[in-house]
Amino acid sequence: MKRSIYAVISLIMMVMAVGFTACGDDDNKGFSAEQIAYFEKNLEFIREKKVLKGDDGELLYKQIVLGGDTALYRVLGKEGEETQCPTSQTPVTMILKGDFISDQNFQKEMTMTLTPAGVVPGLGAILLNNTIGERVEAIIPANLGYGYYDYRGIPAGSTLIFTYTIEKFN
């Protein structure tokens, strides 16, 4: 009887120790105050664009929800009558450039061929809705881009703005 009481008390102590450790306030995952401010600035940019309305009172950006986050896009112009959209494996030839919300460029404008499955998830989901001849502005939040780790010159938590024209599906 005495042993079982000690066992129960030991078990309760272990559960409490694990519980207190799990409830720590270190939710910043080691990010600096400067990084957290950058993340928040990028999130605020997305929040503002989500509710932006055009002259007609309609939302300016279409929204694609993917994995609990939202990528935004709008068609800036269209040439031709093509209505077919690519599949996830369709090679898409486009002229593309990439910018941060500060207008600093991270991808110079150039022609490239990519598949929707071969790019960051947010851009891939938007490409599945595009047709040949469309000029598109896509806004990709960090969760649907490169995430919260630095990646080849792209700072952690960056919102990505891609502007591209679909030339052809190969």
Residue spans for each PLM region:
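Cross-family detector of peptidyl-prolyl cis-trans isomerase
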Residues: 2-6, 19, 23-170
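Bacterial N-terminal signal peptides
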Residues: 9-19
